Each structure stands twice: as structure tokens, then as C-alpha cells.
Amino acid sequence: MDINSNASVSPRPDGLPMTAGYNSASGKVRNSIRSIINHPEDSARAKERSETNSPKNNGNKKPRKKRKTFSCDTCRRVKTRCDFEPFIGKCYRCNVLQLDCSLARNKDNEILNTLREDGLLKKINSINHNLGSFSHLNADSPNESQSSFEKNGTVNFDNYMIDKRLSSLEEHIKSLHQKMDLIITTAKMSYNSDIKGPGDDIQNVDFSSNKTYDSRLTSGSETIRKTGEYRKENLFLNGFKLKESPLKLLHDIDERLFPSKATSKAAKLAGQQRPYAVARVNFLHFYENNQELCHKLAKEFLVRSHFWIIPGGRKEIDVEYAHSHLFITSVFTIIAMSFADNDKYAAEQEILYPLVERLLTNTLTMFEKLTAFDIEAILYCCMFHISRKAKRYRQLKFNSLVLSNFALNSLLHVIDFYQIKDRVLVKEVYNPEDLYHLRILNSLTACYLEYSISYGDIREQDDMLKEFNKLVAKFPQANFGDDIKISEINLGDIVNGIFINLKNYFAQCLDDFNNDRYGGNADTFIFVFPELNYWLKNWEELLAKDGAGVLLFTFDFYHIMICRTFITEFSSTLKSNQRFLKLILNTMKEHSFSLLNGFLRLPPTLIRGAPIFTCHQLVYACLTLCDYLYWFDSSERQRVLSLCTKVYWHLSTIGEKMNEATDNVGKIIKSIIDTSKTRINFGSLSKENSDNDKMSTNANNYTGAGNLHAAKPATSPTNVGTLHENLSSSHFMIPDVDQFNSFEDFFQDFFDSLKPNSQKMFTSDKKTEQTT
């Protein structure tokens, strides 16, 4: 029998169709010779299927449908949630962290539909209706181009994006011109003065301009890479800590020959007498006797100051944590004691302070054995008071600049941040312990920058440290508090760059003012520093989420500091330029008002948990306003006194009970106001008038008499107490707030009790009201 597959196929003898059941029955012997003979049609079908599935025919096979992805590349890589926001053009996470979002290139239709639904596209069409003249670019069919422009919303949207990108480009070019002017001015100055070589000056200019102006303009669907985003091909990943450094090898030899571990009972007993060991044992006894109190106070500190301390930390401690980390437990406890009302824990604080002081001072000798928790404790000693001002004769005031510098260097020595950088950027491993160490580093960096700038100890920051500070933004666990710290570091770095090249920066600001490029207008008459204004725009979204507005405190504080430094350091130049002096004074005054008004909006609970530096900013703003009180016209003087007195009222016993955290600041501000008012008895101010052109001349004459406190502009708030004691015999003093039920009654009595000489400051306003 012919068994060729091409043989004719005979139908079934019974005439029935070949059903599925029939085929399944014959499938058992499909591969046998017998099945091929009896059912040649099955062999033909099998051959057809084999030919269909052959590699030659795979090209005609329908491709497999690819699963649609709804998350961007960055969020998908870290496996986190991705919420696309059509109005912004990128997902929420990439927008907050300022990263490049791949959805910006794939969601054009969704963005356009959102604009249509919101009605924004109609507004764009009406605004850009006259842009139809662009049709002359297509000379072949102008009418067709015009009609398509009017009907197609996509074209209008593209024109809108083009206008937006052109506006952004113009702003970028304007800032570029400012940079070039600064470089040219600095180059001229360095050429005229042979103090430094031209290479050094150009390097300094690069630091102050290029480092502070880091262009981050966003346009359309393409986004220029932000500073916080890394390019792996441009990274400097070769940095590492030497495993066999010379001094480490010598230290290991010394440790082997003269071991620090005790080997005998006498040595163990002597080791227990070391100051650090004694301090730990003594605090452990205090903790065992007051365990519940320590847990309560530690929780109060962690909850009340959660906005200011390291983000993402614990909210309470337990026995195991306390025994493992005695130093930081003692710091939690003693800081919370200053938050208590009416000196509730004064007796316990007297006992606890010597123990904390010994633990803190002995960290210098325990440098090699410090842990991250110990360094975190030193950080909080920099940020908050651990001693009472009323007991200053027994309890020391520690220098926060020295402590923060020591803690920062200790952390860089103890933790290998080069390994962390390699894990995060190359291996993309996000370890919670690494995140904790980076958060300590960022908090220490922000604290050190604030105190170094405020103390006038200006130094250039390490570039590698800046790279470490940015690593937190790469973690999926990063939160709002981490963004706050990064923005604080960025602001401090900008201001630090300004003060490094202060003379050149002042010359550039003066040149911008003379050329009407100072960024102000006739209504506000405020000088806009381009670097600080850039920071404000760059972190605009983050500032909008900061309900308390605490970030703007430091922003206003640096404005006040820069303006006051201009007045004190370049007074001879400002004497010859009255308009620029008035502009700087007005800028300093408005930012002082902004800082004080922002403070008045804070709830009392947040004020009590605020760190020392926030209180320093508050006092400095009041001190500056009172120091330059007589440089303002009469109406502004009344506003200054009213606002400073409101701050004193806010910090006093009305609405809050007396406590260490707020009462001392209120006393300092009260002393500043009293001192500024008693100065009216000295000098000759009766000849003052409201002529703004003579403002600086009168102020300088008054300063020349040696009576104005502004003659010593570098005076710190700590000196105010001494000046206040010298003037304590004056008849005018701010009345006690306990005598009044409201601020209006208090301030009315305060104003009525002014001396006749003091009331002369406001006579012009009263006469004006009477005439009207």
C-alpha cells in the first residue's frame, strides 16, 4: 500500500464526519506506522502543523502583546509607587526629588486631555489666537495651516509650550549675563590688586557663581538633569578609605604591645575608675532610680521636637535601648527638662547635668569608640540647651560650632561613606542603616553650616561632603524631613559662597543697583539677591508644603545678616550712595518683619521644641531692628516697637507658662527693647526729621557720639544683658505682662509710659492725623 502523504484521502466508511472524539481516539497511535496507513489525513495535518511551527515561518507569527507599564523608569527601578500628575508633566516622586521622569515623554495625550477637561486649553487657544501668523512659514499652503491651527488643539498646546520654553530660556540667559558680569568684575579687581593671582580669583568666582547657580530649568517634555540626580558615567567613585594607612598600622602595633583590655583584677578595677566609665555608671544609677521619668521625658522630646531632629527616628525609648545607648538617653532626658513649665524638674536637672557634662566631655577621649548614636547625641547638644541660663555659674555653655565640627569629623571617621556611596549609586542597595547614617550626616552638615556662617567662621565646603549629602534623595524611604535638610544645606552652601567672596559680591550688587538690575520694583523697594532668589524658586514646592514656614526663617535670617554686613563692612562706600543704603536698610527691615511675623504664627508647642538657632534668629532680628531704629522714619519706628513687643508678649506668661525654653529669650528681647528706648536720653535726636536723604547722615552723627549700640554691630545677644544692667537705672522699662489681660492693654500702657523725649518720635504721625 502506498503510504505517501500525498495519497488520496478516502472518506470514512460509515459516512460520518471526523469528530473530535474520533481524532482523540486515534491520537494514541498517531506516531505509529499503522495510524499513518489507516488515517493518512492525520499525517497530512501533522505535517502542516510542523511546517507552520518551523523556524522559517516564525517570522509570520503574530508578535506577543507587550504588557503596558504605568510607572516611570526611576520608580520602577526602586519598586515604589508612581503617581503621574498631568499638570506638572511628571510623576509625584520625580517632581519632589527633582529627577528626570520618563513619563514626560510618553504622556503627551493624557496631559492634553487634562488641559481640555480643565478648560485651560480653551484659554490657551484664546491667548494664542493671534499666533496664526506663524502660517507664513509654510509658503505652499497658508490657508490650510491657518485652519489647522484654529482647529487642532495640539498645535496650540505646542505653541504654548514653545512660549513657555522661550520665557525660561530668557530667564536663564539673564542669569547667565549676571554670572558673566560677576566674572568680569572680579577679573578686573584681581588684575588691579596684586594680592592674589588671577587663577585663584577665577576659582573663587567659579565657586560663588557656578556652584550657587545650578541651572534647573524645566521646559516641555524634556527636563534638564537636576543637581540631586547622578550620572553614573560622570561619578567620582574612586574615593575610598585606606585600609593600611601609615598611622593605622602604627596604631595596631601600639595596641598589640600595649593592650587597652584589662588582663588582671587590678587592671579591671583601675579601668572601672576611668572618667567615662564612672560617668556611665553614675547615669545608669540615675536611670534605674528614675526609669519612668526618663522614658516620659525622652518621649516628650522625641515627639515635641520631631520636626527639628533627625527625620524618620523613633518616638519613644525602652529599657533595652536605654541600656545600650546611655549617652543619648541622658541627652533626651535633660533637653526635655527645659521644656517643662515653671521649672518642674529643676531638682532633677541639677543632679543630671554633671553626669551629662562628663559623658559629653569624655567623648573626646573615646574618639575611636564612638558610635553613631553617640554622635547623634552630640548633635542634639549642639542644637538644644542642656544647661540652664539661670545656673550659668555652675552649668557651662558649650560652643555649638566646636561641637558640630567635632561630631562631623567623628562621623566621617567612624562611618565609611565611600562604601555607602558605592552601594547606593552603583549597586542600588538601600540599606536602612546607611539611611540613618546619612541622615545624621545631613543634620550635622546643616547645623555646622548655620553656626559657621553665624559665627563668621567662613570656610570653603568639601565637594565630596556635598556628594554624600545628596545620597539621601536616592533612597525610596526618603521623606519630607530629608528634603528639608537637603534644602537647608543648599541654602547654607549658597550663603557660604557669598561670604567667601563678600567684597566682590558687594561690588556686583552695587553695580546691579546702578544699572537697575537689582530685581526690585517701585512698590517693594527691596534688593533681590539672585542666588537666594534662585534657591527660593528652586525649592518653591517644598516651601509650599512647609506649613509652619520654618525654612523661611533661615532664608530671612541670611538676608538680614548680609544686609547688616554690607552696612558695617562697607560703610564708607554706602555714605556716597544714599539710595543704595536706603535700599539695603529697607531690605533688612522687611526681612526682619517677615521673620518676626512668621514666628508669631507658630503654635506655642512648636516654639518650645525649637532648637537654639531658631531662637538666635529671632533675637538677631529684634536686635537689628532696634539697633537701626533711628535710621527709619517715625512711622516705621512705631511699627518696629509694636512688632518686637508682640514677640516679647508671645514668649511671656500670657498664653504660656514660664519655662526655660521661652522665658530666657523673652527676657533678652525685653532687654533689647528697653536698651533701645533708653538710648533716646543720649545724643541729639530732636533735630531728626522724616527726610530720607539725611537718614544716614543723622545716624552716622549719632553713632559718632559713641552712644548708639549699632556702633558695635558685631555685638551678640549675650552682650545685651550687660548693656541692660548698665542702663537698669533708667525710668523707662517694659511693664510686667502679668498686670494685663490682652496685648492691646499691655501695649497701650507701654506706649503711654514713654518719656516725653521718646514720644517725640511719633509726633509727626499724630500731627498728621489731627490735620486730616
From Swiss-Prot:
Location within or outside the cell: Cytoplasm; Nucleus
DNA-binding region, residue intervals: 72-101
Biased composition (Basic and acidic residues): 39-51
PROSITE patterns, per the entry: ZN2_CY6_FUNGAL_1, ZN2_CY6_FUNGAL_2
Compositionally biased tracts (Basic residues): 59-69
UniProt keyword annotations, A-Z: Activator, Cytoplasm, Cytosine metabolism, DNA-binding, Metal-binding, Nucleotide metabolism, Nucleus, Transcription, Transcription regulation, Zinc
Region feature (Disordered): 1-70
Keyword Zinc: yes
One of the protein's GO biological processes: uracil catabolic process
InterPro entries on file: Carb_Metab_Trans_Reg, Zn2-C6_fun-type_DNA-bd_sf, Zn2Cys6_DnaBD
Top-rank lineage group of the source organism: Eukaryota
Gene Ontology molecular function, alphabetical: DNA-binding transcription factor activity, RNA polymerase II-specific; sequence-specific DNA binding; zinc ion binding
Family named by the database record: Belongs to the URC2 family.
Free-text function comment from the UniProt entry: Probable transcriptional activator involved in uracil catabolism.
Note: Present with 937 molecules/cell in log phase SD medium.
Protein name: Uracil catabolism protein 2
Gene coding for it: URC2
